[in-house]
A protein has these predicted regions:
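Bacterial N-terminal signal peptides that target proteins for export
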Residues: 1-10
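C-terminal segment of classical bacterial N-terminal signal peptides
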Residues: 14-23
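Surface-exposed, charged secondary-structure patches
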Residues: 26, 61-122
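Extracytoplasmic/periplasmic, Sec-exported soluble proteins
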Residues: 26-31, 49, 118, 122, ...
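Short, aromatic-enriched amphipathic alpha-helices that serve as compact interaction elements
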Residues: 29-47
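Surface-exposed patches in mature extracellular/periplasmic domains of secreted proteins
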Residues: 46-56
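Low-complexity, intrinsically disordered terminal/linker segments enriched in charged
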Residues: 106-115, 120-127, 133-134, 139-158
Length: 158
């Protein structure tokens, strides 16, 4: 019995040591695993298909969020000229996948807020909001940590 327990412990230790990416305390269906799985999928899509129009996005993002973003896309109303989920125009998916760092989550009522960082030199910090939808964790909103940009650039001469 002791040998069995030692083997299980050793196997678990090896598995955890070999696990790539960010060490997060997460269950198979947790806010953290949803966010990590989403960005892994999203960044690996590259130019093959526009992720917002891919039906797989519903596996990670809440239906009302996707539907509103798709409507904005159809009517050319997506804000800021940057990707909604990355908040930048150009990225290197390989670097972003390697540097993806999930920070400790904060639960506020039924919503979980997860800070997320990408990049090497100039880092991109995001705040991802996740809530339950039909029993599964889904992303409801993504914000960056830069100051308010508005819909136009501030002109002090205005």
């Amino acid at each position: 019995m002791i040998k069995f327990i030692l083997r299980v412990f050793a196997s678990l230790a090896v598995a955890l040591a070999l696990e790539p990416g960010v060490a997060i305390a997460a269950t198979p269906d947790s806010p953290e695993t949803t966010v990590k799985a989403f960005y892994t999928w999203y960044l690996q899509q590259g130019g093959s298909v526009y992720q917002l129009t891919d039906s797989h996005i519903y596996n990670y993002v809440a239906k009302p969020t996707v539907d509103n973003l798709r409507d904005d896309y159809r009517h050319k109303r997506l804000p800021g000229g940057a990707d909604y989920f990355t908040r930048v125009q150009d990225i290197d998916p390989q670097i972003w996948l390697k540097t993806m760092t999930l920070h400790p989550a904060i639960a506020l009522g039924g919503t979980v807020v997860i800070p997320l960082t990408f990049g090497l030199g100039e880092k991109q910090n995001l705040v991802v909001f996740v809530a339950r939808e039909n029993g599964h964790w889904r992303i409801t909103k993504v914000e960056d940590t830069t100051g308010y940009q508005g819909f136009h650039q501030y002109d002090p001469m205005d």
